[in-house]
Structure formats: structure tokens, C-alpha cells
């Protein structure tokens, strides 16, 4: 018996070699084989009764293979021949029946079989008759209170089709007295008839769109026919405006639904297909109402596995079709989930009858209880992040005064006179501006109008920029027009002719500032890393870090909203981040359309406010005045410029010494740069060279020439406002166009950065009061929104308030994690940080932790791309509801991407860490910064190999310390230092990451004694799974020293690796009290952490592939770490012991219109800070940069393929190596980590 396969496909089984399926069934051990006389265990037989096209489809096979992994389940597929031709008495026997109708299926026979054998039926058979009639479907939906488009039914007698209640007009039809204006939809009443027609109004050209079942690349065709069909019965319904997408929802039981959107077939009838020929499906998040709809549809139609179509329109969700039994295509995660849920439903129902020892499995990730960084066992309730956009091309703008009547006409046409301002971004609007520019330039050839002539170079530039990409997209260009009643005042840099008093328009053209490919990678990587802040990941999916979030997400327990300002780079950053966060695939555009909300409607993330301009103008004037003095900075200048005592500012001022002399140097370096570019352009070898992001040398020259011209004005003074643009441009060229090897670029970078480090932060205020006033001007709407996000967590989900009967299982509010992500530009990030720093959230003189956080922020000199401010809210369910201790808020921060210099002086915080009270068990230590990978030069051996050393080789030492600044050079044994993880070989980076984030389930309350009880294996499943994955990376790379070998995903972009390790600060997580005895645990349970008990090799392989981390061999020196994507500074904890009440009162004080600038802010003496030895030293951060991927030699490619083949599509519960012990492990694991709620309901 042990030799026979347990997954049958009818009589063809004889042709199957059981060996091919060996890993799907339980093999008896040799000892068991000797005891043949013991009775075999009773198997539950699951019968699959459907047409062969369905039962042998890829999704069905994938799911059945996984169901077969249940130890007590055997799957039998009924042959089509038997179904169609044999009486039901001859059909195979089964205990559970999965049967569903499709074209040609004898549903009557299936019903008779179910009556005869009385198996447990997964999808009710009688209801499948009703699903075939759209009228019945609509009737059931209506009875359930589910929204439908407005509809009417036209029933025709086939023998007398003319007698019916239909009146047809030119642009409407009237059915049974109900009028439908075009566009409307006409559907046959039979659900099997897919010929749905949509009729268009004459104003839009009339005609109709005829939809049909997909044929090749078409799903509909336009027809000039405008009259409705005259034979047959139809449902007429209102056409819903859905932005061209339909949402398909697939349930597996009432508590699980997978949703995806596809391009609506009504749009143009062309099926969008990806490179592999599959229809493009977009990711979708169901909202609370839609989750409830899925729940209702599943139960109302009694179909456990059920697909239905949703239309999202007018802020509502309407069901327009219920398809019955259907599976998601091409989603390995769905296959895993579906098989797991179905297997559990079967076991729960039938195991007791057959006396099979099976208990209701509890899902390890059921309630998101996670270790907070302050050492308490709490439930994560809310994550709020404000994030700056990723790496972008330099922003460019050109101003010109225009007086031509055509511009005034356009201004009037677009209602510009209402506000005196106009922003043109839409393709049609930009086309009109381009047409005017072309026309004026043409006129210039015919007559010499002086006003037009004056603007000729600018008109040409306007035309060039608007023609630049061959198409318009609001993402990369915009034109602003401002009405000037008395014309434009002439500046010193322009011609000093007499000023004209007539009205004119100021035209400002903005372009550039697009997200670069590097920026997309940064955002996607950060999204991937963000997953790791979420709970879970202990179950079958523990093949890669952060899987807990994906799990939360697909089981309705993640309430995610992503907001972005209206700038293209910000929206694309948000989409790329979402792609990484939710493990999505494909292009960013569909993700953007489906997932990113534009927040510009209420000024949430855009800054068009005029209230801040007066204060900012005063600040800018003072700043310019100080920086125009041709002398070394005096003590008075230091006092004027750095009243807040910012270390980074003082450092920049020391470097600059004399601002005018530094500007002279910068100017001469720009002149040198432009002459070098001109020289290159004359060189025939490099004249047509392609620079990064398709820029040409000519465009690069134009960019720098404009800066050269604008930086130094006619009177010899420097325009300080151009410094950020100069820094922007040189940073871009150093980072992306380094291959040009232009001279002195690093010197220009260093000087312009020093100037920008003063100008940029100080433009947002010099004194604390100014910083706060300006910050409020930008951020008040956002602060209000953050406050409401934190407050709403305490309320039940709206659905639960409306429908208490449904307040159970996955809909219960305490199981939700709310995530709100706000993507914005530099101004909002600076402003929000100013509010946190200077708004009196905490008192530095009384709160040691806050003082250290402020000291750290004083050293941060730039809020670079991908800067993050993260607020996390936790709930302790054991505390009284009214207690201040019930809700706990943490504040984290990262200054974003690292700079271009190999900067050893990166500011270092105190880690993503446990609270300062957890000092018991501290050990003396010594920090050895030489092991930090980013300090290694290109010619050194890469230390990442040492860093990711296998956990098995050595016991891991966790050093517990209290968080104080780290010194780069020395740290004496008795010096207080941050909690950190280190080992003799420096295994720290990954240990911090695994033991602290989403690892342990239980954490002690801050201040309690650390107990010595060992951590349960379950609590360390996540840790071990990551260690498992990384062990494989390391072992692969250990081989690398002998054989050049890489795990390369075929589709991976070969220039960009990816990483996640360094995105949480490495200083402390390993000391996490969720695993106080990890060191002993690792010593005793080494095997468990890395062998079969955790995850198998194939799954590990897939985890590695998901993380696209690979090492590339340096031709001469072993290893090289290289990437054009700058790595991102780790997230550092600013405070981890805030109460929700404290944060709420603080946000309320900032958001209230009358709030004065708080005076409570503890002042820091700038002199004291300057003299502080701790703050003068800056320490390096331990961050791993992705390696460059080299092609894999053919010999090793085969072995890599072989090792990773079973798991190519991600960690799957079906991937089991061919060993009996592994089989047992997987089975028991499947039974211990099942989805609780899917087993808690009777069908």
C-alpha cells in the first residue's frame, strides 16, 4: 500500500510512475513495513467530479497536489468518460465531493450521486442550477442586501418574441416602465451566454461594444449597431463608470478572498497580456464592505469556492456577476492557501466520524501579537509612515513673462482669473501651450514683434521641453501661469530697460524631477523591508522575511491605504513601495491606479498654502544676508545661523569658513564642468554618448549652463537659492554619470553639499519658533490626519458597528492592523520632523531617551530620498481600557538614502531597540567597527560573507547594553553602550533583524525581571526561517570561493541586487527580550533552527530568490559590493515609551488653529553640544549594499535550477523533499498552523 500513489486521476493511473509522486505521500519507515498486520489508517477520500478541462487544469492540479499532502486525505479525480457515460452507481466512492458545473457537465447526475452516496459536499449542487440563471443570481444578491447596478428584466416568450415590455428610443430603452439612458448594458439571462452588449449614446458616436468569451487577444469588438437585440430574454442595467477595470474576487470559504483587477473588456476589447502571454491582472485590496460582500456571496450561494465580479464605481462596490466554482490562475500563494483551507474544512468535518486523531489547528499568526521595541507583549494596531520620494532626475524650471493674447485666452479658458493662478498638467492643456509656442516661433520668422523676440530663446526652450518625450504625461512636466496686473518687476540679472505697466502673465515651466530606475528600486526594497515590521511569518510561508504581513493582508486583517501628493515622482515611489510591501509583480502603472490615493484634494501632502510664505521670506532674506558676507564665519554668525545648536550645521560652517569664497570655488568648478562637457561634445568618440536615464551630453550641458548663468548675477553677487539645485545636479551626476569621469566632481559635490546642508534645512526656519511656524504651515492637515489614524484604531471597524452579527472571525476589529503610508516631498518631511523636534512632544531635560534622540537628529545633516518617519501604535489587551498603559506609541526615523561619498561619518542612532530600562544582564563589550561592510573599499575582500556566517558554526553571543552613542574608535568595557548584537565573527546584521522584528510572540513588560525560561520553538520559527534562508546564501557563497556560483533569478535585472537586512538599525535588535535566552537557545536548538524542522532547502532557495541577494566575484580580490542604488540608512528608534494620550494631546496642540508656538521646548546650549565629545564623534552604520550579479556559469546553473526548482514560485506548503522524516514534519506542521477561522464554520 505504501507504494501506491494517493493522488489518483482515474484509470490513467496505470501509466503514471508512482515514483514521480513520491513526495506527495507518506512512506512507511522500514520498521513499519515489518508490521504489515497492523490495520492501515483510514483515509478520507476527496472526489473531484467535473469536466476534464476543469479537473486537469493547471490551478486544479496545483491545488490537488497540495491537498494530497494532508496525511489522511486521498484525492480521486472522476474521469470524464465515467461521468458522462456510466450510471452514478458505478462512479468511484468518496467521503467528500468537490463537484461543479461547466459547459456539458451533467449536473443532474452529480445531484443523483450526492443523494445516493451522501458525501460531504464542498459546493452545494442544487444552488448551481440557480447560478446558471442571471435572474436568480440577482434575486439572491438583492435578498442579501448586496448592491447591484440598477436593472430590469425583459422576459420574452420564444414563440412570440414581439410581445414584450420594451420601448426603444434613440438614446434610451424603457423596460417594464424603467428607463435606461445610454450607455446601458444588455445581458442574456443565461449565465452561460457571455455575449453581453454595451450601447453608447449618439453624443459619443453611438454603436455598441460586443463582449464575448476571450478569443486569443480579444474580449470584445465595437459594432456600429445601435439597436438592441429583438429575440431572447435579457437583463438591462445601468452602465457603471469603473475607470476601465473590473475586480474579480475568489473566495475559499467565507473568511478568505483573493481579489485582482483586470482591464475591463468593455474598454477596447484588447486583452492585456504579459511577456508570458497571460492576461494581466492587477493587485487589489478589498475594503471592509467588499470583504463583507465576499462573506455573504459565499454563504448565500453555498459555494465554498466561488468567484464573482465587482464593479467599483461612485464610491461603492456593486456585484454584477457570480460565477460559482473558480480558481485564481498563476498565484502560488493562492494555491497554498486554497489547499490548506479546503483540507482543513474536510478534516474538521470528517475526522471525528473516522476517529482520525486531528485537532482544530490554531494559526500561529492569528492575532498579531508582536514584540514592541520597548519589551512588552503587545498587539500591533497601527503603522503610520511619512516617506520622502525616491531618487529623481534634477528638477528644472524656466520662467518667462508672456503678453501675447493667445496666452491670455488660454488663461481665461481654464478659469485662471478666479484665483489669478493656473496649473496646467493635463496632456490636452500642455498641447495647447505647445501649439501657442510653435505658432509664436513661426510668426517670429515673418515679423519682428519685439515682445515675442525678447522671449525667443525661452520660447524655443518651452517648445523643446514640451516636445521632449514624444507624448504628454502629467507625471513629467507642468506649466504654471500667474497673472501679474502690472507686469513683471525686472531683476538685476535681466535687461535694465524701462518696466512696462500693462498686465502680463508669468509662465513657469517645470520639468525633470522624475523618479529614476534607482529610485524605483530603493522604494521597492524599502517596501520589502517594511514587511518585516509586521507580526507573523511563523507558518508554512516562513520561507522569507516579512511574510507575516502578506498573510495578514490576504486574510482581511490588514487595512492599508497609501496616499501620495500629486507629483509624479511621489506617486511612482508610492507604487514601487506598494509593489515591494505586498510582493506584487509587474508594472507600476496598474499598481498606481489601483492602490495609490491622490491626497492633493485636501492639501494633505501638497503645499500650495500661502500662509507660510511671509515667515519663509523673512527666513530666506536673513539666510541670504549671512551667506553673502565675504569673510570667515564669526561667532555672531554661528549664533545667528545655528540657534538650535545643530551639530551638522556647525560642521558644515566649519568646512565652508568663508561663504563667498566657497561660492567662488563652486562657481569656478561649475565653469570647469561645463567646459569639460563642451570638450566631450566636440570629441567625435563621445558626442553621441548616452547618459543615465536617456539624457544626452547636450541636455546635461544645458542643465549646467543654466545653473552657471543663474548662480552668479550680473552684479557679481551669488543667488543662494540656486545652491540646492547645484547640489541636486552634482549629486545626480556623481551617482549616475560617474562613468564620464569628469574632473573635480567630488570636490564640487563636497562644497555644494556643505552649502546645501546649511541652506536647505534653514529655509524651513532658523530659530525653533520659525521652524515650528513654517512646519505648521506645511503640515497641519497631515498632523490632523495622523491624529485621526491613531484615534480610529480604538474604534471598531464601521462594518462591525452596522452588522454586529458579522463581528466574528476575520472581521473582528482586534485582529486588524491599520497601515497608512503618506508619500510626499522634502518640505513635508522637514516640517513634520521640526514639529516632532520643537513642538514639545517630550521634555529633553526630564526624558533621557528623548535627549539622546535629539542629539542624534542634531547630527543628521540631510533628509535624503526615502527619508522615513514611522509611528507605530501597539495595544496591550491585558490592560484596562481606560488605562494609559493600554496603548503604546513608538517613533522611528531614518534619514533615507546614503550620500555619494564613501562617508565613514554617517550619523548613528541608538538602534531599532528595546527600552532603556532593560539593562539587566548587561555585559561588558567592545564594538569593532572594522567589520561593517560598507566601510570596505572596492579593493578589499567583501565582509558580507563573514557577516552572513551560518548560525550553526558558532554559538551566538548577545550582548545586552543600554542605548548610548557608539564611538567609532573605541568603547571601553565599562562604558554604557547601545544594545547590540555581535559575535566573534560579526554575525550581527541578520541576527538583529530576526530576533527583534516579528519573532517572539511574548514579551515581558518593561521593568519586569527577565526570566530564564527558554523561548518556544514556535516563537522562533520566523528567526529560524530567515536563518535557514541565509544559511543557504552563505553556503552558496562558501562554494563561491571555489566555484563562481550565484542564485540568479532569470528575470532579475542584472544590474540591481536587493537587500533588506540593513533597513532596520543593527545596533540593538539582537538584545530583544522576546528572545532573552536566544544565545542558549541557539546552542541547544542549533539543529532545529536550520534543519528539517523549520523549512526545507527548496523553500529556502525561493526565499533567497525573492530577496534577489547575490554576491558577485571580483576578478582579483574575491568579492566586491557594488550597486548604483544607494543603500538606505536603517530605521532608528527615537522614542519607544510614549503613551497614546501623550501623543494625541501633542498632535491636538499642533493641529488646533489657535495653537501658539510651544515654549516648553527644552533648549540645548549650542556651545555645550559643540564641546560634547560624544556628539563630535560619528559612527558608521552597518548596512549591506546589494552586490552586482554576474552571469552564472552553465555548469552551476543546472545545479542551481535543480535545487530551487520545486519552489520557483515562492514558499509553498507543497514543497517537500523526498524523505519520510520530512514528510512527517510537513504534515504535522500543516496540521498545527492552519487557518483557525476557516475551520471554525460549518458549511
UniProtKB/Swiss-Prot annotation:
It catalyses: 1D-myo-inositol hexakisphosphate + ATP = 1-diphospho-1D-myo-inositol 2,3,4,5,6-pentakisphosphate + ADP; 5-diphospho-1D-myo-inositol 1,2,3,4,6-pentakisphosphate + ATP + H(+) = 1,5-bis(diphospho)-1D-myo-inositol 2,3,4,6-tetrakisphosphate + ADP. InterPro entries: Acid_Pase_AS, His_Pase_clade-2, His_Pase_VIP1, His_PPase_superfam, VIP1_N. Residues 1195-1209 have a biased composition (Low complexity). GO terms for molecular function: 5-diphosphoinositol pentakisphosphate 1-kinase activity; ATP binding; diphosphoinositol pentakisphosphate kinase activity; inositol hexakisphosphate 1-kinase activity; inositol hexakisphosphate 5-kinase activity; inositol hexakisphosphate kinase activity; inositol-1,3,4,5,6-pentakisphosphate kinase activity. It comes from the Eukaryota. The C-terminal acid phosphatase-like domain binds PtdIns(3,4,5)P3 and InsP6. Despite its similarity with the phosphatase domain of histidine acid phosphatases, it has no phosphatase activity. Belongs to the histidine acid phosphatase family. VIP1 subfamily. This is Inositol hexakisphosphate and diphosphoinositol-pentakisphosphate kinase 2. It comes from Homo sapiens.
